Amino acid sequence: MLKRPAYYNIFLLPTGRRLAKTYNILENLITLPKTDWKLYETIEQKLKWMIQEYRSDWRDRLSHHERYGMKVRLTYRSESERTKLEEKITDLVISHGKKASTVHFCTRESYKGRVRANQILILLEPEGLGEVEGLTVRAEGNWMSLVTHCLFILGSTLTCFGFVDPARGCRFNLLPYIKTLHPNDKWLLDLQASWRLEYGVSRSIEEGALYDFFAESHTLYAVRTWPGCEKYLGALEAFVGRLAVLPAQVLTSKEHDFQSKLMSKAKKTGFHYLYYLVSFTMKTSLTDRIVKEALATVKVFSFVVGRDHLPAVGVYSGEDFSKQFLSMAVGTMDTPSRYAITIVSGMQVDVDVKSVTGIASFKDGTQHTIVDEILLQPARLVLLGRKGGGKSRLSKIFSELGYNVLDSDTYGKVLTLVADRGEDGLDDALKKFVRLTPDERKAVPSIFETEMDRLCEVFGSRGLRPYAQRCQQQAGRLHWELYAAFQEFYDRTIRVITPDKFRFAYFAELERGGFDDNGLTFSPELKTVVFVHSMPELFEAMGGCVAEIVPTHSTRLAILLRGQGLSVNAELHLHDFYVALNQNGARKVSLGWLVHALNELLKMR
């Protein structure tokens, strides 16, 4: 029997393979062995029946029926029928070479949760008791074929549920054939509607032909659950197949050790790297002294990117390289590389890609458990991030996911509008702010930015040099006095209108009307994501899912290059104040990894 494909698709099913041959969609379609053909034939029968029987919620019902073991409800008209049904089902099970204990008859109360491996849970009920989750079949209906199907695929890694898992499916564009498509075959459109990838767009037909519909030698294994891979549960000595090599970043120490052993067991041709290290040089002479000193001893820089966004070796313009590859970077290896990718993106510096190599050892401090939590889309998210750390980019992705977004700078901007009116002025200030245009909002300075700018002038008159002149190399008494003065102002200000009180009032006003910082109205999904600058603001919201965003680039250099705010000097000092204030606290997640994971999630919608 052939192995599990990298992605499920309609060409594994009899109807899909018939269409492929009829319309010459695919060449050299591998003929399935009889055992596979029989399995996919029975899977197709149930999928087609489900789609036709439960038009609106067939996926949910199928999930209940199959995801945690087999569960089926059979309804009967009289109690005498019940006894006969039990006997017929038991006889059917035994006739298929299974033990009678394979089937367990249960009550409605126990018709929930997980089922033991290699067991079928059957709920026998009289008709008219109302709906339950999952599948319901009448006794006079075709229940025997359904139970037979359950017995046939019991214990198999290929189930009907696998065909509707969004992360495991790959669509094929059937629209060019829709006019001539037989009505009885249009259920395939419903089947692949939620799949996140598409042949010819995000996955090539060549890869599909090789791995999906499908090659005998191919099973792509990984040491943990991962899209497009099958988790390897066997012994080290028994490993045969291709290994998806994941970076240490996303693995526990135990998983990483097991992967290393599998890599030594597998042949090099069996490696399937999912992430790569791209090394490049910059084709420019650096004149800025701070940047020049930081990069003086480093000539080659690097970043990590997924296999779907790999550059070829060669020269690229800074603009093209930034858009196509740096925007997809999931991490960097060192501080000089953070500087380099910030320079390339901000100054459009041309680059020369020297090498692209698969990577397994990359780790930047991200705790991947927090990524998994965020991907579950909790109702309340609070993310701590530096100034210039890429929060705006994240906020747009969360908006696409249906979140109501509160930007980190909004708190300070609204406090500027509140002025000296305190809590009494908050409602009026919020009503005004959520109805401002994006340009009008940009023109409103943050109260914290205004105060830092004022203090920079005060301490500048005492001899404090501008930030860009040696501040990163040395800090003296005036720097500490500057931050101490700002700390006093900051502590006093956040106690007048606390961050948590502000957040509650902001979302309440947004629900009444107006727009958030991404120009969107209030989302009815009632999910919120709040970006903050500091730990004190974060502690005001301990109750949601909390994380700190670690930037992939140099935030100081990004602020210097973009030149936003009242002054670059004040922005840079604010940046350092927040960094010093935060230190260690929340679980950390790399900006690149989180953006990468959320974009993968968006593909599934």
Curated annotation (Swiss-Prot):
Keyword Glycoprotein in annotation: no
UniProt KW keywords: Host cytoplasm, Host cytoskeleton, Virion
Keyword Coiled coil belongs to the record: no
Superkingdom per UniProt: Viruses
Subcellular location: Virion; Host cytoplasm, Host cytoskeleton
One GO cellular component term: host cell cytoplasm
Described purpose of this protein according to its UniProt entry: Minor inner capsid component. Displays NTPase and RNA 5'-triphosphatase (RTPase) activities. May function as a cofactor of polymerase VP1. Associates with microtubules and plays a role in the formation, structural organization and morphology of viral inclusions, where the assembly of cores and the replication of viral RNA occur.
Subunit-level organization: Interacts with VP1.
Protein name: Microtubule-associated protein VP10
Organism from which the protein derives: Colorado tick fever virus (strain USA/Florio N-7180) (CTFV)
